[in-house]
UniProtKB/Swiss-Prot annotation:
InterPro entries: BrxB/BrxA. It holds the Pfam family Disulph_isomer. Belongs to the bacilliredoxin family. The lineage of its organism: Bacteria, Bacillati, Bacillota, Bacilli, Bacillales. It comes from the Bacteria. GO terms for biological process: cell redox homeostasis. PANTHER family: BACILLIREDOXIN BRXB, UPF0403 PROTEIN YQIW-RELATED. This is Bacilliredoxin SAR1592.
Length: 145
């Protein structure tokens, strides 16, 4: 690969990581990290991050803005598809019944998947639509803070 392309992609990945982390999501980079968090009681929103356009233009902004709400999950975490492969694979093992999809969101409660917002529910939609989908999940499975 061209060195300039590699440098460019490293910058894109770093920006995507920083954007979701600054919104309050914890980066999970190993299978052990994933198990430690997802096996806990309570609710966890998992954002499956990626470098595609709909992740940057829709999913990450929605992940951030959806948190301006009274009903929220207990924990916010992220795995990065294509980057943190071990962590992403382990997270997907919890998402039984759902095909691998990125970007996407999974709401896990007491170690079990409740529902997912998959790529096809993000791509081609606007940020507000995805925020509404997330907040609907929060209302259904989470408690007011």
């Amino acid at each position: 690969m061209d060195m300039n392309f590699d440098l460019y992609m490293n910058g894109v990945v770093e920006q995507a990581r920083n954007e979701i982390e600054s919104a309050g999501y914890e980066q999970l980079t190993t299978a052990e990290d994933v198990d430690k968090v997802l096996k806990q009681d309570g609710t966890t929103l998992v954002m499956i991050n990626s470098v595609c356009g709909c992740a940057g233009g829709i999913a990450r902004p929605a992940a951030s803005h959806a948190l301006h709400y009274d009903v929220l999950p207990d924990r916010l975490v992220t795995v990065f598809a294509g980057q943190d492969k071990e962590a992403t694979q382990r997270a997907r093992e919890y998402f039984e019944g759902y095909a691998p999809s990125s970007p996407s969101f999974a709401l896990v409660k007491d170690g079990n998947i409740t529902e997912m917002i998959e790529r096809h529910q993000i791509e081609g939609h606007d940020v507000m639509n995805v925020i509404n989908q997330l907040q609907t999940l929060f209302n259904k499975y989470c408690e007011e803070r």
